[in-house]
Amino acid sequence: MTYRFSLLMIALAWSTLVQSGPKEDAIAAYEKFFTLFTTGNQIQVAALFAPDALFYGTGSADVVTSPEGVIAYFTGALSGTRGEVRARPFENTVLQLSDAVVAISGKWQSERTLDGKMVTAGPSRVTVVMQKRGDKWLIVQFHNSPTPKPRPVVAAAVPSG
């Protein structure tokens, strides 16, 4: 009897560990961006975006509002000799707005081999809004920009006297 009870308790504990909710599902879909970014396949990257997504890439002068615009952006961004490429998100803050909408803000950086040396780009700031449409989580809003350099600390003037 104790053995069966122990198995039941383990099964219940395991089921709560493997269940995920909207927040976890949205994060998993968002992290696919970084995996696909390293492949250089702009079509696959663009497929992560909703057809009506609002998109500001690092080099976008204006908001991009069409799938063709997103593909064109990544065609330029992912072209050229890339060598080995890695991309990783970090410092993510996640806000679940509903069962179908999740906002994620954080940073990310990419690393690529250039002339035999690993070169780091970033970190960049990124904010995305993920929305569940049907059975897929898609990016409906994306804004990426360079992280500003910290301002130098200026010592306060000490009054004499």
Name what the model sees in each region.
Residues 38, 110-114, 130:
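Beta-strand elements of well-folded, non-transmembrane domains
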Residues 19, 81, 116-117:
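Outer-membrane beta-barrel domain signature
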Residues 11-51, 153-161:
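Short, low-complexity N-terminal intrinsically disordered segments enriched in polar/charged residues
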Residues 24, 42-100, 120-121:
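A solvent-exposed, acidic/Ser-Thr-rich amphipathic alpha-helical stretch
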Residues 100-110:
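A short hydrophobic beta-strand element
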Residues 123-153:
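Short beta-strand edge/turn micro-motifs at domain boundaries
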Residues 52-55, 60-62, 109-112, 145-149:
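Solvent-exposed loop/turn segments at secondary-structure junctions
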